[in-house]
Amino acid sequence: MPRIVNPLDEMLFKEVLKEQQRIRVYIEKARYGKLKTIIEGIDEKEFDLEDIAKKLKAKLACGGTVKKGRIELQGDHREKVKKLLADLGFSEDLIEIE
């Protein structure tokens, strides 16, 4: 990441980064046949995955965690997650739902 001195420039840089993230959202089967929504592709060096997960869990009223650089949410929330990530500033066109 280039060195940015001006805080406004840093905010703009983060916004541009958000719009360039290719995010993949899909489901996996967890224990006992339960589903979990997996969100991967968000750069964990540039963005606080814990904070994003916290916001998503609050909006979706579900549990979840951050593991191995990806966000895991309990239940199938694929379509809702796409809209919520777009609301957080990520480009909706680059969010791939499987």
UniProtKB/Swiss-Prot annotation:
GO terms for molecular function: mRNA binding; translation initiation factor activity. Keywords: Protein biosynthesis, Translation regulation. It comes from the Archaea. The keyword Protein biosynthesis applies. InterPro entries: DENR/SUI1_TIF, SUI1, SUI1_arc, SUI1_arc_bac, SUI1_dom_sf. One of its GO terms (biological process) is formation of translation preinitiation complex. Coiled coil: none annotated. Gene3D superfamilies: SUI1-like domain. Belongs to the SUI1 family. HAMAP family: SUI1. PANTHER family: DENSITY-REGULATED PROTEIN, DENSITY-REGULATED PROTEIN HOMOLOG. NCBIfam families: PRK00939.1, SUI1_rel. This is Protein translation factor SUI1 homolog. It comes from Thermococcus onnurineus (strain NA1).
